[in-house]
Amino acid sequence: MSVTRHYDREFVRTFFTSPTAVDGEEDSAKMLRSAGQLRGLQAPDVWVPDNEDATAPNMRAEGVENIIDVVANQGAEFPGEIHPRVVWHRESPATRYKGFQQMLEITDPENGAVEHIDGFVIPEVGDIDDWKKADEFFTIIEHEHGLEEGSLSMSVIVESGEAELAMGDLREEMGKPSNNLERMFLLVDGEVDYTKDMRAMTPTGELPPWPELRHNTSRGASAAGLIAVDGPYDDIRDVEGYRERMKDNRAKGMTGIWSLTPGQVVEANTAPLPPKTGSWLLEAGGQEVELEAQDGKQVYDGDDLSLEEVSDGGYVLQAGGDRLELDEDELTEELLDRTAYIPSMTDIVDSMEEFEAAKEAGKGAIAMTQAATLVINGVEVDISKDRMWDEATYQAAQTPITLFQDVYEHRPDQHEELAEMYGADIVERATAVGN
């Protein structure tokens, strides 16, 4: 069974939730109205007016009215997709029925919002049969309101062991004539309720990192042609921790992440994009340290590594408690083992264009050279290494460019900021390479 993606977007970077009604405010929809005005890199790829956890139970009826009002009036201008979250629970028929009623009212064509609604987010799902119940409600709503069958997309939040196991069944269930699960869009982790469902405990009370769940969600999305999104990172002041979480996620194939604030939206929108400039990393003190570019050289300015040139033409490299006496070739090999390069957008595009030209000329593989002059304690060492590029290497390098192209296609409101970030020429080349 081959995987066919049924959605235009291949990537989602940001999943931003907003309360639908705030109690005690003169305008209970003020946070919705504010979110609906976001543009450019401050606007998420997916905006989620949240009528579940982010909104108090006694405000949810008003929240439905606010969703209709704000989306009807601001939805046409909003640059991302709009997917309200409604109430649902795998163990509560009454809650599921409330969610159905909320969706039915929001999508009523007479209310003027449905033309700007891309789908809905269903929380607290259980096994695959529960997913089918939600899908059936979507189909009933579409039939009731004269909408095209399958036109409303469905995303779920994985918040239980049942839902985690259900992802393994999804690939086989999608496309069966008895359901419309091809409407599926996002698989979103909900680590808070997942932790509760798993009865997990930590000494500090903080959430476990759940790398297994994130891997399983990414795998489930890949197998079914969907998009995986990580859950909320609730320490909103810990920007570096948020970046590290996203970096770890991307290594698992999970590009998207929940954003709780406009500041997190900007971070999550920019983090997956190729960097503007390349950088060299040097392993020192058990971690990778980014070197400082100075006059075309890469300078290490730390205390965990020292280098001295001795009189016989050799070198002494001290790393932690180790003292290594090396000749020039041995030093070069040692430093090559300790260094890595993060390519810039320009580097990736240059390499892809070079490989495309070589392939056009009949070559199946070519060598790409990376070279730098390292400076440690004032001692300069030239290093270089060749990396073979074949079709597999090319396709792996293409992923960040495919992401950029997907963003450029679906988020024209970000074109100006992307041109400012990279330069108009490299943006033009990046949108053309690989096509």
Swiss-Prot record:
Cofactor or coenzyme needed: Mg(2+); Mn(2+); Co(2+); Ca(2+)
Catalyzed reactions per annotation: (S)-malyl-CoA = glyoxylate + acetyl-CoA; (S)-malyl-CoA + H2O = (S)-malate + CoA + H(+)
Gene Ontology process terms (BP): oxaloacetate metabolic process
GO molecular function: hydrolase activity; magnesium ion binding; malyl-CoA lyase activity
Record Gene3D superfamilies: 1.20.58.1560, Phosphoenolpyruvate-binding domains (3.20.20.60)
InterPro entries cross-referenced by the UniProt entry: Aldolase/citrate-lyase_domain, Malate_Synthase-like_Aldolase, Pyrv/PenolPyrv_kinase-like_dom, Pyrv_kinase-like_dom_sf
Pfam family, one: HpcH_HpaI
Keywords, sorted A to Z: Calcium, Cobalt, Hydrolase, Lyase, Magnesium, Manganese, Metal-binding
E.C. numbers: 3.1.2.30, 4.1.3.24
Binding site for Mg(2+): 159, 180
UniProt-listed SUPFAM superfamilies: Phosphoenolpyruvate/pyruvate domain
Cofactor binding description: Divalent cations. Mg(2+) and to a lesser extent, Mn(2+), Co(2+) and Ca(2+).
Domain of life of the source: Archaea
Segments forming a coiled coil: none
Residue sites binding substrate per the record: 159
Family: Belongs to the HpcH/HpaI aldolase family.
Entry function: Involved in the methylaspartate cycle. Catalyzes the biosynthesis of malate in two steps. In the first reaction acetyl-CoA is condensed reversibly with glyoxylate to form (S)-malyl-CoA. In the second reaction (S)-malyl-CoA is hydrolyzed to malate and CoA. It can also catalyze the condensation of propionyl-CoA with glyoxylate and of acetyl-CoA with pyruvate, however the CoA-ester hydrolysis reaction is highly specific for (S)-malyl-CoA.
NCBIfam families: malate_syn_AceB_Halo
Name under which the protein is recorded: Apparent malate synthase
Gene: aceB
